[in-house]
Amino acid sequence: NILASYAIPGTVIPPWLAEGTAQFMYDNADWDNWDTHRDMILRDRAINNNLLSFTEMNTFGKSGIGNESTYNSGYKLCRFIALSYGSDKLKEILINLSSPLQFSVNNAIKKAIGITGYELYEEYKKSLSDGYQLLTKNIKSNISSPNIIIDKGTANMHPTWSPDGTNIAFISNADNDFFSQTDLFIYDKK
């Protein structure tokens, strides 16, 4: 008798695919929808050439808006796969990943749709960039220089004027590590 041990990864489904398929679900599902907040984050990354790479989408552990971007990128990429190749391909990718000898999402994607995950990512990236360039063309021709009142934090939200109009109260994750950790800030307009 010979005893042998082989290191086999227990989880091969990357976060973008797990979260993206959970949010997409299936055709005509109406539980979780693409919304303006998700779109704003992804649009900003796309037009500023700062999209998460295919490899970066495969992990959490980022600070600020980075983890949120893994969710948003995964949801959008799963929608892209469903719209471009058919929603059945998402299921096929997951089935491919369930094989005991399949350790690569890149290969599982190639087996399902005929191109590697990296090639798919480049198609997705081009589609995003082209789409957002078209949508922002008129905006870009009328850009104004804003007066930035605070440049800390990745989430500065829910601004509210004081009754006398001299202060702005808002919540921000400035001085915190995560998107969900916010404090109340008061900005004095004076």
Regions found by a protein language model. Give the residues of each.
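Acidic/His/Gly-enriched intrinsically disordered linker/tail segments
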Residues: 1-91, 95-143, 147
